From Swiss-Prot:
Pfam families: RMD1-3. It comes from the Eukaryota. InterPro entries: RMD1-3_a_helical_rpt, TPR-like_helical_dom_sf. Belongs to the RMDN family. It is a single-pass membrane protein. The keyword Ribonucleoprotein does not apply. Residues 122-153 are annotated as: Disordered. It is found in: Membrane; Cytoplasm; Cytoplasm, Cytoskeleton, Spindle; Cytoplasm, Cytoskeleton, Spindle pole. Residues 122-131 have a biased composition (Basic residues). This is Regulator of microtubule dynamics protein 2. One of its GO terms (cellular component) is cytoplasm. SUPFAM superfamilies: TPR-like. The chain crosses the membrane at residues 10-27. It comes from Bos taurus (Bovine).
Length: 410
């Protein structure tokens, strides 16, 4: 049998076996008792509903109401469990799709004597520049404990593949700057999308010196948000979001009247919520809105704040019935907003800074389309197209604008 045929047969067997194994693991996982979020268990929030007590103490009519509410909670729990299963299944399918090509590449490399090449994230490139004389262990499976730049310790990462900020002792030839010079340089670097990593590294180099300076702390939290946006690895994103949120908490505690502290704490809460269960997502949503409003109170002329509030209002206006019901069950009140309210915030952005961003024009077009004001929607689609695509957000907005334009022309 030719050597190539042998390789193909072995590859097919291994890939097939891996696929069957993953399928069996998934099947057993689904059959086991779930640890997914159970809504009633999370209702210990001060005004929690103790159904058994209510049934004993209330008159029969109120007891019937309590039973009905209990059944509503059970239905919501089942629906939430179903949604959780679907999300887990989607994630497992995604992982499987990613794993099989990598497995094939690895086997081909082993059979052909080749070395597997891994994709490198922005953080890996940054570390290579900073540690040109230090050889990284690209295939190590050992865990490493990363110290956060705010002086906190995070959980161990899974592999060395997740390249988090370099410890201070490895940084060489660091130029010492005073606080004003550091802030100016970090802000200037951050203006350029391709130099945000460099801005982050600069702040890392000076964390010990300025860790108690409020102007440094909120910028450092912002830099972690930038790293979250740049990263493509889930564990890295969690790492940056959590440390950034911790720094944001430190900032608002030390400077409760600093609008930028509230702004970036709100943003980091939004990032952290991406990895949380339903209750925490809703909780972080309230926290996001609370600190966004405080930031607007202290920075009424900052257009970015109104853009974020517009995004929040638009998202809330699109909540489904089940999402609203769950929010009401968990917190006793329902987040509410309208497309018109979202539009007013986007218009405020344009008033403060015309041509603020492609995304702002895109959301204005969406709002006008939802309000059936087609001419206005097309106007802002056209304005969005005129702005350059610089960031990933710009590119995503450009794609969305094309979809909106196409739908409006039908």
């Amino acid at each position: 049998m030719p050597h190539s045929t042998n390789r193909e047969m072995i590859l097919g067997i291994v890939v097939g076996t891996a696929g069957i194994s993953l399928l069996l693991l998934w099947y057993h996982k689904v059959r086991k008792p779930r640890t997914a979020m159970s809504l009633p268990k999370f209702l210990s929030l001060g005004n929690s509903l103790d159904l058994m007590t209510l049934q004993d103490e209330m008159p029969s009519g109120q007891g019937t109401t309590a039973i009905f509410q209990g059944r509503q909670l059970q239905i919501l729990e089942k629906l939430n469990e179903l949604l959780t299963h679907m999300e887990e299944l989607k994630e497992e399918i995604r992982v499987l799709k990613e794993a099989i090509p990598k497995l094939e590449e690895y086997i081909q490399g082993e059979l052909g004597g080749k070395v597997t090449v891994h994709k490198i994230s922005p953080q890996h490139r940054a570390r290579k520049r900073r540690l040109a004389t230090v050889q990284s262990s690209a295939t190590s499976n050992s865990s490493e404990e990363a110290e956060s730049e705010g002086g906190y310790v995070t959980a161990n990462t899974d592999t060395e593949e997740q390249s988090f900020p370099v410890p201070k002792e490895f940084n060489t030839h660091v130029e010492e700057l005073n606080l004003d010079a550091l802030i100016q340089r970090a802000d200037n670097l951050r203006v350029n999308e391709s130099r945000k990593v460099e801005s982050f590294e600069l702040l890392c180099d000076h964390k010990e010196k300025f860790r108690d300076e409020i102007e440094f702390i909120w910028r450092f939290a912002r830099a972690y948000g930038d790293m979250y946006e740049l990263s493509t690895n889930i564990q890295e994103k969690k790492h940056y979001a959590n440390i950034g949120k911790t720094l944001g908490e430190k900032a608002i505690m030390r400077a409760p009247k600093n609008g930028y502290c509230h702004l970036w704490y709100a943003v980091l809460c939004g990032y952290v919520s991406e990895f949380e269960g339903l209750q925490n997502k809703i909780n972080y949503g309230y926290r996001f809105k609370e600190h966004l409003d405080k930031a607007i109170e202290f920075l009424p002329e900052e257009p970015f704040l109104y853009y974020l509030k517009g995004r929040y209002c638009y998202a809330v206006s699109k909540l489904s019935w089940i999402e609203r019901k769950m929010a009401a069950t968990l917190f006793g009140n329902i987040p509410s907003s309208t497309v018109q309210e979202a539009l007013q915030n986007f218009l405020k952005v344009e008033e403060l800074q015309p041509g603020f961003s492609k995304s702002n024009y895109m959301f204005m077009a969406k709002c006008y389309a939802d309000l059936n004001q087609i001419d206005s929607a097309m106007k802002f689609c056209n304005l969005a197209v005129l702005l350059p695509c610089i960031t990933k957000e710009d590119k995503d907005a450009q794609k969305e604008v094309k979809k909106i334009s196409t739908s409006l022309k039908r």
